[in-house]
């Protein structure tokens, strides 16, 4: 335990926590415009063509965001909403596009886990 005198000379320093999603600026989601929509390959040992897009956010940041689900309707100039959450096997991809919000349509014929892919409840 430090003495009062030691604390007067050199106070305790708060630890600085670095954000995993700096472009969101402490917001839950951010809006942006797609500048490029493309596929990329994951790190070893995985193999696929992952759908990603480059997005210019309203705060001026340019980030790469993953497009989850099977099939999408995004193209250049689409307005999308992004949330935090990295993709472990894609280096540099720290954000996810929100399906079913703004210009990004929900996943077609999705029956389970619908809320994560912007799909309304089907008529039974």
Curated annotation (Swiss-Prot):
Top-level taxon in the UniProt lineage: Bacteria
Q: Which PROSITE patterns match?
A: RIBOSOMAL_S12
The answer to whether the entry has keyword tRNA-binding is yes
Instruction: Please give one Gene Ontology molecular function term for this protein.
Output: rRNA binding
InterPro entries to which the protein is assigned, alphabetical: NA-bd_OB-fold, Ribosomal_uS12, Ribosomal_uS12_bac
Which keywords are on file for this protein? Methylation, Ribonucleoprotein, Ribosomal protein, RNA-binding, rRNA-binding, tRNA-binding
Q: Which GO terms describe its cellular component?
A: small ribosomal subunit
On whether Ribosomal protein is a keyword of this UniProt record, the answer is yes
Query: What GO biological process, any one, is recorded here?
Result: translation
3-methylthioaspartic acid occurs at 89
Record-linked NCBIfam families? rpsL_bact
Q: Which family is this protein grouped under?
A: Belongs to the universal ribosomal protein uS12 family.
Q: Subunit composition?
A: Part of the 30S ribosomal subunit. Contacts proteins S8 and S17. May interact with IF1 in the 30S initiation complex.
Q: What does this protein do?
A: With S4 and S5 plays an important role in translational accuracy.
Listed name of the protein? Small ribosomal subunit protein uS12
Q: Which organism is it from?
A: Glaesserella parasuis serovar 5 (strain SH0165)
């Amino acid at each position: 335990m430090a003495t009062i005198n030691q604390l007067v000379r050199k106070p305790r320093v708060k630890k600085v926590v670095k954000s995993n999603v700096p472009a969101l600026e402490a917001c839950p989601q951010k809006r942006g415009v797609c500048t490029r929509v493309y596929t990329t390959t994951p790190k070893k040992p995985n193999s696929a063509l992952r759908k990603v897009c480059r997005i210019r956010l309203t705060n001026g940041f340019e980030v790469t965001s993953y497009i989850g689900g099977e099939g999408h309707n995004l193209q250049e100039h689409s307005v999308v909403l992004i949330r935090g959450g990295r993709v472990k096997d894609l280096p540099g991809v720290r954000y996810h596009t929100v399906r079913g919000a703004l210009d990004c349509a929900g996943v077609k014929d999705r029956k389970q886990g619908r809320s994560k892919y912007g799909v309304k409840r089907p008529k039974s």
